[in-house]
């Protein structure tokens, strides 16, 4: 019965961990462009408001972008911007 006295750890791969921000943004960008929208305006609208209506269902873009939290998307955008524009 020693096995029952120990606390076991259960680990499950979170679906969000397997989703890459870069892939999400590029897929959503392409879907918006194909539908004739201004991708930057639509993505910014979604990030600021949280309203998924800014993102079309085309190419499953709406469900893809909702796999990540908005703050995760914003964090990665800021990191990427600073990485590419920072002078050291």
From Swiss-Prot:
<dbReference type="Pfam" id="PF06135">
    <property type="entry name" value="IreB"/>
</dbReference>
<dbReference type="InterPro" id="IPR009309">
    <property type="entry name" value="IreB"/>
</dbReference>
<comment type="similarity">
    <text>Belongs to the UPF0297 family.</text>
</comment>
<protein>
    <recommendedName>
        <fullName>UPF0297 protein BC_4382</fullName>
    </recommendedName>
</protein>
